[in-house]
Amino acid sequence: STGYGSGDRGRDALDKLAAEVFRAEAGFIRPSLLSGTHTLAVALYGILRPGDIMLSVTGRPYDTLTKVLGLDQTGDEKPQISSEGSLRDLGVDYRQLELLPDPFTAEEPIDVPAMVEFIRRHGEKVKMVYVQRSRGYAFRPALTVSQIRRAAYEVEKVSREMGIRKPVFMVDNCYGEFVETTEPCYVPEGAVNEAPADLIAGSLIKNPGGGMADVGGYIVGTAE
């Protein structure tokens, strides 16, 4: 054995199973992804490069992501003292849009017009549109799968109209797994004005592990 795990049929089968469970093109599931934050960080560092804009359209993410993003503990867009190695330190520009003023009654809590306008203004510099499905520690509702996919549709639509590369639409799916009949990366037949998320990521410690898993995470989405 070379030690690289090449040809590990069990691992490959498990990855395919993860993709099948979430109805995605491809999947990656590992116990070496220690937590939800670790899993999200792996996905973010894998996609974002210096000069890219990461646009969160659900406001400030979990507090545990502030060091990954390079924000201070109040969410201000300035580096914190311990931000060395963060996405901001590496040249990634983090921006955020807040949800609509009354997200509990809005049919679509994401401020879609503001999101579309941001993409029109910054074009291909917007490498990622980021959605946190769960409410986290904020006073707002969790997003439904349809609400997320409608936002993904608008991102795809404006990108097509502008003739630019579509931003990666990524969803922090923690706490959202299996609470509906579909997931953000899959659009069921009959759905109107919806598009699948390119990437969803979450922790096995939460819903998928049934409260019994101590570690683990998954990243599923398009094969690209």
Please name every model-derived segment.
Residues 1:
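N-terminal glycine-rich, Lys/His-bearing helix-loop that initiates the first secondary-structure elements
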Residues 5-8, 13, 17, 26-27, ...:
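Conserved PLP-enzyme active-site core in the AAT-like
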Residues 23:
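Metal-dependent phosphohydrolase cores
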